[in-house]
Amino acid sequence: DEIIILDITRKLKFIDKNKNFFFKTLEQISKNIVVPLTVGGGIEKLDDIKTLLNNGADKVVINSVALESPKKINSFASKYGKQCIVVSIDVKKIDNEFIVFTDYGTKKTNYKLKDWIKIVQDEGAGEIFLQSIEFDGSLEGYNYEMVNHISQVINLPLIVSSGAGNWKHFEKLFEFDFVSAASTTNIYHFTESSIKSLKNFLKTKKLEIRV
């Protein structure tokens, strides 16, 4: 239903737009798909978002810039509409508390997960993309404890990522009625699974899935 691309070269691509192949690749991808394309990595200012939208992105993902300056969430949403702004949150459990990390999960912040979600929502984000650092790539299931932890504070569309290894992991995730979507990568890279077969499985479980 949606493709998310996160560029780990970050702000480097914005230094010389003409020489960086990322934008040409992005434009080519956008011309050959019929689903929304969400792109992130290194966004710091309004012009960065404009560049991505002009090269085929439908929505953008921000992370570190929001943690550095939460007011930028509001600034970006005011300019391009909140439906365009997805805030990704990288989380790790430390001393029995879910803590937010930055710089692709390498640096600990002072934010607890629920506190940060409240700020993100108050600043006008349109969507949250939630990732578990420990569960990423595990194929052992989503971090259901983390998802349950935010059940009383989340009021935005929520995409949950990290850990899916089989279809039952998706079924269990969607038992949380506030989860809007499930994101995954490794299950398609390292198994014989396909998106179509996943959707067919979820349909048999009476879940509302677009096939």
Task: List the model feature ranges, each with a label.
Residues 2-22, 64, 129-140:
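Glycine-rich, proline-tolerant flexible connector loops at the mouths of alpha/beta enzymes
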Residues 3, 39, 52, 87, ...:
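Conserved, mostly hydrophobic/aromatic
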Residues 3-5, 37-41, 60-62, 85-89, ...:
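Hydrophobic faces of well-ordered beta-strands that scaffold small-molecule active sites
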Residues 9, 18-80:
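Glycine/small-residue-rich loop that forms an oxyanion/phosphate-binding "nest" at active or ligand-binding sites
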Residues 17-27, 109-114, 140-148:
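Charged helix-capping and loop-helix junction motifs
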Residues 33-56, 145-182:
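Catalytic cores of alpha/beta
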Residues 51-72, 132-137, 162-169, 176-197:
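Glycine-rich phosphate-binding active-site loops on the catalytic face of alpha/beta enzymes
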Residues 57-130, 134-135, 206:
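Conserved anion-binding
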